Amino acid sequence: MEDQIRQLKDIFDRFDMDADGSLTILELAALLRSLGLKPSGDQIHVLLASMDSNGNGFVEFDELVGTILPDLNEEVLINSEQLLEIFKSFDRDGNGFISAAELAGAMAKMGQPLTYKELTEMIKEADTNGDGVISFGEFASIMAKSAVDYFGLKINS
């Protein structure tokens, strides 16, 4: 936890251009862009408002920690375990990969049957090394990308 706080402080200080101990909306936008995110102006305003617990229009370091670290501390560990469980539920034969047939079966079981076109598009998008199956790493990447898209932020390609 201390390492995470130290890393977060380094990042915060790097983007606190005037070294006043707080991030302006422009400094927050620069920090987000450095992480590969492309939030719109409205999204940055909403994010700043949600982080700005003292209502002064800036994000202080403790507000950043209060927003980010609870998630890093508990949620990330829980989510990686949950992600592995989801992956295993798709990987019916337990070989460490999700085949097209396993993906189709799992989606149908969840009440979301796929057309052949949808299935091939999903495999193509997730299968970054082109071996025809989805590894856990590829599965985790596509799930992370989906989460980023869900929150309305875009990753630089």
Swiss-Prot record:
- State a single Gene Ontology molecular function: calcium ion binding
Q: Output the Gene3D superfamilies linked to this UniProt entry.
A: EF-hand
Q: Where does Ca(2+) 3 bind?
A: D91, D93, N95, E102
Q: Record-annotated residues binding Ca(2+) 4?
A: D127, N129, D131, E138
- The EF-hand domain is annotated at 3-38, 39-74, 78-113, 114-149
A Pfam cross-reference name: EF-hand_7
Supply the SUPFAM superfamilies for this chain. Answer: EF-hand
- Residues annotated for Ca(2+) 1 binding in this entry: D16, D18, D20, S22, E27
Q: Which UniProt keywords apply?
A: Calcium, Metal-binding, Repeat
- Residue numbers binding Ca(2+) 2: D52, N54, N56, E63
Q: What does this protein do?
A: Potential calcium sensor.
Question: What is this protein called in UniProt?
Answer: Probable calcium-binding protein CML15
Q: What's the source species for this entry? A: Arabidopsis thaliana (Mouse-ear cress)
Q: What is the lineage of its organism?
A: Eukaryota, Viridiplantae, Streptophyta, Embryophyta, Tracheophyta
